[in-house]
Amino acid sequence: SGLPNGARIEIEYSDETDGDGNLIDQRQRDTYIARGDGRERFCNKFNHHAFRYAEVRGLAQRPRREDFRALAIHTDYRPEATFTSSDSDLNAIHDMIAHTLRCLAYNGYMVDCPHLERAGYGGDGNSSTEILQTLCGAAPLYRNWVQAWDDAMRPGGSLPHVAPNAGAGGGGPYWCGFIVMAPWQTWLNYGDRTLVDRHYPAMREWMGYVERYMKDGLLTRWPDTPYRDWFLGDWLAPHGVDTGNEASVSLVNNCFVSDCYARMAQMARLTGHDDEAAAFEARREALNRTIHARFYDPATQTYATGSQLDMTYPMLVGATPDSLRAGVEQRLFR
């Protein structure tokens, strides 16, 4: 109250401050022009902000705490699981994960972060699907999001790294392959085969696109496009995004393709495409043999760079022969 007509009030939001307590600029701002009728009230109906701190500029006097109210928004999914233990650290980790999922799930899909890009990256989706679907009844979210991926597919099966696809986003095969993994996980976790039945043709088309970029039995880098950048492998390596080692990038991406072949074979059988199931399984077995032959060093019992992911992924997808598995595990643990 008490603001003259035309007074300009600015509110800046951030989830970080610098050493002096100043907000770090995250380009989250609202501007309000006062009516001057003594009944000023502002609620942004067209945007949201993710923040821990807010700074108000343009008021003639210090506002009261009760003058402000923050409203949390998120997808209306149902909590389906709880976790408690005698370990306060584990309880805190669980609670932080649950809160993070609430912050990332809105607009009917998951985003990478709620304050900067706000984009539905497939890599973030693949890495969070199992935990979100374990904690929550979120099948409607995945029905909406997988449809966005299907809608974003280009002629010939090419996919972006982000859906809905408003522009280019960085990633790799693990991002595009959300269209395979999300329907599979939704059926596995919820017993809901709607996405498998509806999007199996799109999954099959994307696998065909992948195969057009295979050379000597391995997936190679596909081109950047106006809607897709990069060809990442392990983007969560301990020392940063591991894009510098081509062997690691190739190993990780081909292991993911192997995993996609396995899921496609299972979903092909589920949908009555038995001949296609056998073909996908044969391609998986051939790819696994090539992965092992190309990236395994028998002298050191390591794959590619010997990083944790390079060592574990071939075992997870079945590329490591049973006779060598114990040695690879021992080398990993050392």
Give the location of each predicted region.
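Extracellular/oxidizing-compartment recognition motifs
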Residues: 1-114, 123-124, 140-143, 160-164, ...
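Active-site core of glycosidic bond-cleaving carbohydrate-active enzymes
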Residues: 120-334
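Phosphate-binding glycine-rich loops and their immediate beta-loop-alpha structural context
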Residues: 117
